[in-house]
């Protein structure tokens, strides 16, 4: 019930559960893998966030993996729901941010599960590009059945074995993601902005027995917030208060979380609570000249009203930026970065990742739309641009303008298209000198290459086609039900004969 000191009680309860999960499971297993020279991986996030019943803080758990990981199911792009899979910006940004802060080189995704038998190479590329742009750099394809007899046919296909007709051609796509995995695990993603997750505020409203609708309202508001930032090409990391507790400090006017130091800290909409350790560091950060950006004014510390927090925010009002909405003005004032500039962007599904190498900057652009082209221009501090073709492994100069300090380039990405660029720090790069294309030549883009036929095309049927029956009539003990979906009919039959559902569904049979 929401009575008495209920916010503090819920906060402390979920904080205790989360910390016990870390202390009694994540830390010992991480230490064991360190001793044995193994990389521990796996995914914690499920598909019900901001519900907390499967864990109190996803990012807190990632911090103890040698290779933090997520899964990414299905093939329906949804960039709105906090419980979506493909399209869920927050889920992948949590992974990438934790890896940045802990120094994990590789981030894994179990990808494509449940996408269906009809997924195409274009679908595979589109989903993979999207999650790689947001922070994944190692892929584990789901799934590789040894057999598809019976109910296995609908056990979360596609199937990555010779049982799929495209298997012999899949190497092309695998090589593509292998090259992306290499370049996106080199260098560092160095973001200057830390956006706190409202996890400890959600704790106040989450209940195992009677969830408050405000829980989903906070989660949805945060989902919109990070998705808007991502589509505005802002560069930022997300912050877990549990990770901040263990790895946070203030040094040189920066808010430090592990291996990352941030010049700005952002408190997102609907945030009510800060943990005591987080508040202490924010206070030190602002007093040291750091920039605090508020889209909400928290009033609680550890679930209790805090006059000290209110006084701090009032006394430092002139040093704190406050916004009521994440609009164009807020993005331009508080999220712009001189290290990369986007102009005249058209297309609502453009994503990017920029990584800093010792000798330059790497930029990966993807267009996740299946219908619209994404166009615009981008500027980077460099002397030239080189395109890295992740399909062929080729390197070639990319058309650009230069003023001695920076380069500017136009891009046009077709639906499900991508572009990988490298901007050398200074001088002319060895990549450009050894490239196969001449500088300034017109660059064909994916989807724009015309293939001429080598001769007449003839298609021959090798064997009779299979006619799939999705609906059927079922007769059991003289009683007939008509037009049932075959999956439902199977369950009814198994229930009648054995008193249980289909034992072949989501189960293992050895005979």
Q: Model regions: which residues?
A:
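Carbohydrate-binding surfaces of carbohydrate-active enzymes
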Residues: 1-511
């Amino acid at each position: 019930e929401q009575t008495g000191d209920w916010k503090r009680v819920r906060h402390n309860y979920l904080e205790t559960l989360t910390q016990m999960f870390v202390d009694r499971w994540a830390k010992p297993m991480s230490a064991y893998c360190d001793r044995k020279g193994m990389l521990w991986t796996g995914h914690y996030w499920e598909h019900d966030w901001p519900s907390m019943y499967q864990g109190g803080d996803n990012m807190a758990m990632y911090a103890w993996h040698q290779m933090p990981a997520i899964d990414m199911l299905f093939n329906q792009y949804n960039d709105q729901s906090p419980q979506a899979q493909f399209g869920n910006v927050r889920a992948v940004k949590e992974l990438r941010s934790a890896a940045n802060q802990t120094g994990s080189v590789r981030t894994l995704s179990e990808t494509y599960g449940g996408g269906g038998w009809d997924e195409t190479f274009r679908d595979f590329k589109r989903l993979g590009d999207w999650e790689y742009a947001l922070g994944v750099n190692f892929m584990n394809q789901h799934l590789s059945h040894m057999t598809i007899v019976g109910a296995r046919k609908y056990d979360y296909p596609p199937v990555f074995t010779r049982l799929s007709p495209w298997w012999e051609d899949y190497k092309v796509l695998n090589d593509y993601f292998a090259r992306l995995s290499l370049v996106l695990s080199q260098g560092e993603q160095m973001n200057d902005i830390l956006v706190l997750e409202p996890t400890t505020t959600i704790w106040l409203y989450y209940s195992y027995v009677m969830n408050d609708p405000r829980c989903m309202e906070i989660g949805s508001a945060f989902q919109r917030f990070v998705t808007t930032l991502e589509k505005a090409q802002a560069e930022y990391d997300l912050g877990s208060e549990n990770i901040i507790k263990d790895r946070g400090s203030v040094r040189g006017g920066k808010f430090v979380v592990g291996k990352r130091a941030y010049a700005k800290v952002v408190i997102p909409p609907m945030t009510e609570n800060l943990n005591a350790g987080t508040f202490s560091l924010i206070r030190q950060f602002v007093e040291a000249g750091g920039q605090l950006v508020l889209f909400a004014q928290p009033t609680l510390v550890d679930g209790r009203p805090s006059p000290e927090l209110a006084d701090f925010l009032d006394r430092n009002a002139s040093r704190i930026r406050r916004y009521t909405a994440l609009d164009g003005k807020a993005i331009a004032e508080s999220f712009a970065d001189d290290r990369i500039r986007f102009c005249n962007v058209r297309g609502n599904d453009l994503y990017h990742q920029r990584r800093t190498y010792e000798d330059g900057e790497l930029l990966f652009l993807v267009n996740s739309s299946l219908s619209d082209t994404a166009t615009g221009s981008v500027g980077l501090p460099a002397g030239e641009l080189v395109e890295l073709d992740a399909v062929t492994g080729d390197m070639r100069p990319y058309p650009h303008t230069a003023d001695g300090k920076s380069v500017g380039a136009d891009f046009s990405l077709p639906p499900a298209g991508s572009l990988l660029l490298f901007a050398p720090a200074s001088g002319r790069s060895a990549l450009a000198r050894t490239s196969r294309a001449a500088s300034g030549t017109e660059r064909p883009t994916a989807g724009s290459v015309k293939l001429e036929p080598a001769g007449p095309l003839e298609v021959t049927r090798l064997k009779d086609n299979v006619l799939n029956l999705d609906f059927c009539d079922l007769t059991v003990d003289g009683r007939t039900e008509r037009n049932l979906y075959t999956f439902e009919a199977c369950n009814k039959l198994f229930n009648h004969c054995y008193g249980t559902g289909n034992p072949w569904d989501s189960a293992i049979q050895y005979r």
